[in-house]
From Swiss-Prot:
Gene transcribed to yield this protein: MYC
Organism: Avian retrovirus OK10
Acidic residues: bias regions: 228-240
Domain bHLH positions: 331-383
InterPro entries, per database record: bHLH_dom, HLH_DNA-bd_sf, Myc-LZ, Myc_transcription_factors, Tscrpt_reg_Myc, Tscrpt_reg_Myc_N
Descriptive protein name: Viral myc transforming protein
Location(s), subcellular: Host nucleus
Subunit: Efficient DNA binding requires dimerization with another bHLH protein.
Purpose: Transforms avian and murine macrophages and fibroblasts as well as murine B-lymphoid cells.
Length: 416
């Protein structure tokens, strides 16, 4: 979005009506930032989403960017390079971040829940472009400070509480911007409040005593390689976060009411350095055994104990006599083989006896069993037919005998 030099007002808080299409209000019950957005009776709109940055190809502002409207309001009517950068910073969400997301820096739970979960703090591909632009702008400001305003830029110590007087020229405006930039660094939120664990394994560079914190503003950016692009894409494993370390080295914390864990995790004061940190996501291991012991009722516990004892006894029996079970199986197998052999021998002898009873195969020692059975069947049928025939003959003979007896009786009676 191009920035025009003829602006109607020096105050860079743009009218809300002009950018109203880019904001939205959520429902009352679904607004998660309602507690942080409400100050008295004023409601602040949420910051635009990541789609707005991608749509207008804007560079995302670094997190924790403080407001520097007082110094910019006192600048000249024609915005200089520093004024344009400040306008870009505020337009990209510097003040909106401070008013919408970080309304209460002391509320650690709110900062952790909002900064880590919001899409603007998760880091995306525009972070590298932002670092590059900031590096170029800072180099230009340092060169202009050395040429035009060495006296104003070399002032050490904390910044004055009131607004500074308006500068005389563009060089003084750049030096004043650097001075306000170093002063606003003290208002930034400590990264240890947001991330209670170490953010980077590399130690920051130490600042020489008496140096201006704004002059030491550097960019610690690794070269853009394929591995860096792959790391940025793998957002499930790592989150790319751009943070600002505090620049006041002589300032020491005197609060004794902080917790021991926060004191242990709080990093040392270092120069104002724009650096990229990788935060590992720790996932709970749901496969781990439960730490608490489950208490069962007395009856159920007794039943479980008895079941365990019986199972242990059966396991002991199985484990104590493996050889005995093997020997028993061998004996059973041997007995089965002996009985099977006896059965076969008896069957063979039966076939031999049957063969001897059949006249057709009696002399054939090599007659197969099928032939023996077939001939035996035929022989049985023939014997049965002979039996029926003999029974019929016997009946005829019995009748003949009865007739002869009756005839004999008649002859005896006739003689008498």
């Amino acid at each position: 979005m191009p920035l025009s030099a003829s602006l109607p007002s020096k105050n860079y808080d743009y009218d809300y009506d002009s950018v109203q299409p880019y904001f939205y209000f959520e429902e009352e019950e679904e607004n998660f930032y309602l507690a942080a957005q409400q100050r008295g009776s004023e409601l602040q709109p949420p910051a635009p989403s990541e789609d707005i940055w991608k749509k207008f190809e804007l560079l995302p502002a670094p997190p924790l960017s403080p407001s520097r409207r007082s110094s910019l309001a006192a600048a000249s009517c024609f915005p200089s390079t520093a004024d344009q950068l400040e306008m870009v910073t505020e337009l990209l969400g510097g003040d909106m971040v401070n008013q919408s997301f970080i309304c209460d820096p002391d509320d650690e739970s709110f900062v952790k829940s909002i900064i880590i979960q919001d899409c603007m703090w998760s880091g995306f591909s525009a972070a590298a472009k932002l670092e590059k632009v900031v590096s170029e702008k800072l180099a230009t400001y340092q060169a202009s400070r050395r040429e035009g305003g060495p006296a104003a830029a070399s002032r050490p110590g904390p910044p004055p509480s009131g607004p500074p007087p308006p500068p005389a020229g563009p060089a003084a405006s750049a030096g004043l911007y650097l001075h306000d930039l170093g002063a606003a660094a003290a208002d930034c939120i400590d990264p240890s409040v947001v991330f209670p664990y170490p953010l980077s394994e590399r130690a920051p560079r130490a600042a020489p005593p008496g140096a201006n914190p704004a002059a030491l503003l550097g960019v610690d950016t690794p070269p853009t390689t394929s591995s860096d692009s792959e790391e940025e894409q793998e957002e499930d494993e790592e989150i790319d976060v751009v943070t600002l370390a505090e620049a006041n080295e002589s300032e020491s914390s005197t609060e004794s009411s902080t917790e021991a864990s926060e004191e242990h995790c709080k990093p040392h004061h270092s120069p104002l350095v724009l650096k990229r940190c990788h935060v590992n996501i720790h996932q709970h291991n749901y496969a781990a055994p439960p730490s608490t012991k489950v208490e069962y009722p007395a009856a159920k516990r007794l039943k479980l104990d008895s079941g365990r004892v019986l199972k242990q006894i059966s396991n002991n029996r199985k484990c104590s006599s493996p050889r005995t079970s093997d020997s028993e199986e061998n004996d059973k197998r041997r007995m089965h083989n002996v009985l099977e052999r006896q059965r076969r021998n008896e069957l063979k002898l039966s076939f031999f006896a049957l063969r001897d009873q059949i006249p057709e195969v009696a002399n054939n020692e090599k007659a197969p069993k099928v032939v023996i059975l077939k001939k035996a069947t035929e022989y049985v049928l023939s014997i049965q037919s002979d039996e029926h025939r003999l029974i019929a003959e016997k009946e005829q003979l019995r009748r003949r005998r009865e007739q002869l007896k009756h005839k004999l009786e008649q002859l005896r009676n006739s003689r008498a």
